[in-house]
From Swiss-Prot:
Function: Catalyzes the recombination between the large inverted repetitions of the plasmid.
GO MF entry, a single one: DNA binding
BP terms from Gene Ontology: DNA integration; DNA recombination
Family: Belongs to the 'phage' integrase family.
Gene name in the database record: A
Organism: Kluyveromyces lactis
Annotated stretches, region: Disordered: 376-401
Protein name, per record: Recombinase Flp protein
Lineage, top ranks: Eukaryota, Fungi, Dikarya, Ascomycota, Saccharomycotina
One Pfam family matching this protein: Flp_N
Length: 447
């Protein structure tokens, strides 16, 4: 019972029985790795259950407790004393709860304290990470280059230069572009449900693709959007490249909440490898800050960009779409302002780089260049060279979901592994968007 998925649904009584069985076993050895790991897991679950204010148990909290307990756990067999340290400031009530669950043993739970370090070490540690230093770095980045997508493109070039596999290139590019374009956390991209992908008609950008994620930091669901961007950072093209070379990933258990979600979108380990890559390969001061934002670079960059563009009302200080709906978690409510499922279409018009605010202001947007605009639904369905076999269609009058289905697309086999998870209509749209985008690029080069 050493993994979160196995232990999360145990009752306190079941946890206590498991612990008693281990401690009373004839072969019990506190130093045996497997036994120590099981006990740390069970005591972590008991600890989380003791904190009754928590409405759900999350895997990251479990890992934090398990690490501290596993390193500090000791057992005096003669006097039946169990001792361990946990990452809490006050442990009196927790100690009483565990003693009541294990009446045959004396339990000593100590609060976690950092090891004593010298004055010089403390000085070095406090200067490794500084929030104001991080903010200053993002301000400096945007002072040198006002076009946010040129900044992103410069970083994405390192993926092409230094990534060994096409899979890693596609993963890193999708993570970077998706986090910037949605001002979201890595976990929002990772946890989005592929089965919820749908086509949505943005009133400025035309048909785009979006999916829902419910496991956000605030536990308020939101959309993750993939849409056209002026330049070489098109989120729909990035999505196409990812689906071409990456396989579906089964959903990992991240909390004790029941869910019918069968797949997640990004690998669990991607944030770690992505952060390491940025530190080693990208010559940008912000990536050299110890414990600074790397997998969260995108949301920090977009939050700073919108704030400097007088659009700060759309983001919280920590970089998520702002909203005023109630957030369940008290901690999240204190630190994260995300409370909106949807975002105004005008926000994406501005971010995309295709539009600018009209001189009249009041967030009225017009095309920067009428000859350079996103692919329209008519262009995607035009008969000339159209493998969809569908007649031209008029766009819907309201920017709601595009209900008209695309007919069978010969490129659908490119995404065969996603068939049955992402709807064929969405996969067909992505394939056709990529094809028409390529044709337009070729015409532009010839011209």
């Amino acid at each position: 019972m050493s993994t979160f998925a196995e232990a999360a649904h145990l009752t306190p009584h079941q946890c206590a029985n498991e612990i008693n069985e281990i401690l009373e076993s004839d072969t019990f050895n506190i130093n045996a790795k497997e036994i120590r790991n099981k006990l740390a897991s069970l005591f972590s679950i008991l600890t989380m259950q003791s904190l009754s204010i928590r409405r759900e148990m999350k895997i990251n909290t479990y890992r934090s407790y398990k690490s501290a307990i596993g390193k500090s756990l000791s057992f005096d067999k003669d006097d039946k004393i169990i001792k361990f340290t946990v990452r809490l400031r006050k442990t009196e009530s927790l100690q009483k709860d565990i003693e009541s669950a294990l009446p045959s043993y004396k339990v000593v739970v100590s609060p976690f304290k950092n090891q004593e370090v010298s004055l010089f070490d403390r000085y070095e540690e406090t200067h490794k990470y500084d929030a104001s230093m991080v903010g200053l770095q993002f301000t400096n980045i945007l002072s040198k280059e006002k076009d946010i997508w040129k900044i992103v493109s410069r970083i994405a070039c390192f993926f092409d230069q230094s990534c060994v596999t096409t899979t890693k290139r596609a993963e890193y590019r999708l993570l970077l572009l998706g986090a910037v374009g949605n001002c979201c956390r890595y976990s929002d991209l990772k946890n989005l449900d592929p089965r919820t992908f749908e086509i949505y008609n943005n009133s400025f950008l035309g048909p785009i693709v979006r999916a829902t994620v419910t496991e956000t930091k605030s536990r308020t669901e939101r959309y993750v959007n993939f849409y056209p961007v002026n330049g070489d950072c098109d989120l729909l093209i990035s999505l196409y490249d990812y689906l071409r070379v990456c396989s579906p990933i089964e959903k990992t258990v991240s909390s004790n909440r029941p869910t019918n979600q069968t797949h997640q979108f990004l690998p669990e380990s991607l944030a770690r490898t992505f952060s390491r890559f940025l530190t080693q390969h990208v010559d940008e001061p912000v990536f050299k800050i110890w414990n600074g934002p790397k997998s969260h670079f995108g949301r920090h960059l977009m939050a700073t960009f919108l704030s400097r563009s007088e659009k700060g009302k759309y983001v919280s200080s920590l970089g998520n779409w702002a909203g005023d709906r109630e957030i369940q978690s008290a901690v999240a409510r204190s630190h994260y302002s995300h409370g909106s499922v949807t975002v105004d279409d005008r926000v994406f018009a501005f971010i995309s780089g295709f539009y600018k605010e009209a001189p009249l202001g009041s967030e009225i947007y017009v095309l920067k260049d009428p000859s350079n605009k996103p692919l329209s639904r008519e262009e995607l369905l035009e008969e000339e060279g159209n493998s969809l076999g569908s007649p031209p269609l008029s766009p819907p009058s309201s920017p709601r979901l595009v209900a008209q289905s695309f007919s069978a697309h010969p490129s659908l086999q490119l995404f065969e592994q996603w068939h049955g998870i992402i709807s064929d209509e969405v996969l067909q749209f992505i394939a056709e968007y990529r094809r028409k985008h390529e044709l337009r690029s070729q015409r532009t080069v010839v011209a």
